[in-house]
């Protein structure tokens, strides 16, 4: 029997038109709950989430009374998560089948504290996921340079590799996170709002591993409208 011990946390803002395409991909066998935090969306996100819950009983819906941004929403999800493991997802990123199982196995095999997945971004002219994957098989890069705070995780590698950072899509034990939370002083879509969170884990001695076979596909920009992006990308 497969143990269901992973809590998925997904903030969402104005992505009602994507939720039926995206959320079902996260209900993988090892997942005990998918926590979606509706960040006071102005579209019909609330109604769509209620419809999805009729089919997927593991969906947990949290509603922010006002728009509080990604950091608050992720922290809110962390505070109620009941799984032994945490996985952070996104409301415009499709989780490939078997990814959660793969990340759990990689964590066990490598002794990693944090396992990061590969995220690929579809171009506007790409019609399906395979086109996106094939392009990155040619053009993908793997960079993990702490001295320059430079990283790229789009290359397909033959095996998991140790690194100092990961994409936002990580799997880790809840006890590894402990009392650490995303810093609420960041406003806007900073040098990625999760960068500080990741580096705090790394500098505390946690081992990061990147597994390119754990894969998410981000929908193209003309479809992935809405979301939490802001103009104040470097505001602190």
What do these predicted regions represent?
Residues 15-28:
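Short, well-formed alpha-helical segments that are part of the catalytic scaffolds
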Residues 25, 38-48, 66, 93:
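A conserved acidic beta->alpha catalytic loop
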Residues 64-81:
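Glycine-rich, basic loop-to-helix element that forms the pyrophosphate-binding segment
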Residues 86:
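Short aromatic/hydrophobic "clamp" motif used to bind/position activated sugar donors
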Residues 98-137:
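Conserved donor NDP-sugar-binding/catalytic core segment of glycosyltransferases
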Residues 135-162:
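Short, flexible, basic/aromatic active-site loop/helix in glycosyltransferases
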Residues 164-170, 175-180, 187-214:
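A short, conserved alpha-helix in the catalytic core of glycosyltransferases
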Residues 208-236:
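Active-site-adjacent helix/loop segment of glycosyltransferases
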